[in-house]
Amino acid sequence: MKPFPTHPDAIPAELQDVMDRLGTVAIEVANRIARGGIDEDLAGLCGTNTDGDGQKALDVIADDAFRAALEGSAVRFYASEEQDTAVTLNEAGTLALAIDPLDGSSNIDTNLSVGTIFAIWPAAATAEASFLRQGSELIAAGYVIYGPQVCMMVSFGKGTQKYVLDPGSRSFVLVDRAVKVPPSSTEFAINASNYRHWPKPIRAYIDDCVAGTEGPRGRNFNMRWLASLVAETHRILARGGVFLYPRDSRKGYEQGRLRYLYECAPIAFVITQAGGGATDGENPILGQTPSRLHARTPFVFGSAEKVARITAYHDLPEQETSALFGNRGLFRS
């Protein structure tokens, strides 16, 4: 059975074969994760990627599986977070696909949700021209989350769709054609242990949230942090709120840590197509052009009003971002 047997009109015809291949591998990866520790150690380190990050066994397994499945498809160029350079799969192909085959792999041994993130552009004459372009030129992007449910969230530029894997039929079932980010929430996601390294506008925003009912926001907030981008994204699509991974003062973190091509652009596409916002803290993510395949960027996304508020904190005068929370010239609701 094909992985998307129902609602064939939901996927553009020119992308149907590629989506079938992605879906088939995602189902295989989900099964492999479910048997982790029985057949093999999926969490064991087996090398490093181009940026020196440790690669788990499942990182490599997933990358190899997606790449092999896309051979002979309409994908001309394949760029993976796990590989130094892009590769040509089909000289006659019309698409360029970037992928993070296994996002959140540091969570494998803890049984927290991990995922696959993908982005599809029209192929240009070269791999560099295909991938080093604005995220606004994407024709499709999405992610698969391997959790208590296996879900795929995907956009083809006309809203965001949600599919759930039916374990019985081993196929993805369309359950929502028009996912929307809830407009408000009292949740924010950030790694607070890095507070001392953040820029002042980010510290000011978090200070005002942490101040709760005693601060200018006049309400209490909850902090979340899962260290799995797909899990954070899935929660925000379900409950709203905002995710922040800012630049900071540490060496190697001047532009954040998340990669534009494999993580930020596709997630921003999914979120904005669902009515949310996505920026680098100040400017829209989808309006940016990466300088190299593994370029990084600060990343803020979630409910549109929350993202706009964080941008407003960057517009405050220096003395206000340094001031106690009661003195900022911002809207307070």
From Swiss-Prot:
It is found in: Cytoplasm. GO terms for biological process: fructose 1,6-bisphosphate metabolic process; fructose 6-phosphate metabolic process; fructose metabolic process; gluconeogenesis; reductive pentose-phosphate cycle; sucrose biosynthetic process. Its main location: cytoplasm. The keyword Hydrolase applies. Keywords: Calvin cycle, Carbohydrate metabolism, Cytoplasm, Hydrolase, Magnesium, Metal-binding. GO terms for cellular component: cytosol. Belongs to the FBPase class 1 family. Mg(2+) 1 binds at E81, D100, L102. It holds the Pfam family FBPase. It is an enzyme of class 3 (hydrolase). It catalyses: beta-D-fructose 1,6-bisphosphate + H2O = beta-D-fructose 6-phosphate + phosphate. Mg(2+) 2 binds at D100, D103, E263. Its cofactor is Mg(2+). This is Fructose-1,6-bisphosphatase class 1 1. Substrate binds at D103, G104, S105, S106, N191. InterPro entries: FBPase_C_dom (IPR044015), FBPase_class-1 (IPR000146), FBPase_N (IPR033391), FBPtase (IPR028343), Fructose_bisphosphatase_AS (IPR020548). Binds 2 magnesium ions per subunit. Pathway: Carbohydrate biosynthesis; Calvin cycle. Homotetramer. Its EC number is 3.1.3.11.
